Amino acid sequence: MRLFSQDTKVQALKSVPLFEGLSRKELVQLERICEDLRVEPGKVLCREGQIGHEFFVLVDGKVQVARKGRRVATLTGGDFVGEIALIMEMPRTATVTAETPLRFFVLTRREFHAVLDQNPKVERKVLRALARRLAETSSDPTLA
């Protein structure tokens, strides 16, 4: 069931730093493989320590982000969780639980990689954005 318009999803994807260099046409390619979902309060979207396979973009509602059982953040519509899961298999660093009725969409690693395999230009742009993010967040200036 389609919960969101194409434009809503494209605008949300555009705000994700990993996708900042993508054109509207390329964002539409990603939008087409996203699944629209709705869950009730208490539903766990991802659990700390488990390998992540999905990236979540929140549209309406609120989630709690917890590490080692302690709340570290609250996220709402427009926020996103799990972009690293699109790139590599790593354990989740936090548990994310719906606090209110939640509407969101999901992009899986498998579908994302299929788009990258079919479109090397998108892959290059995503890798550039990832490298830029790593450079910005690196606290060691000798890693340049």
Label every PLM stretch briefly.
Residues 1-144:
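Cytosolic regulatory regions built on CNB/CRP/Popeye-like sensor folds
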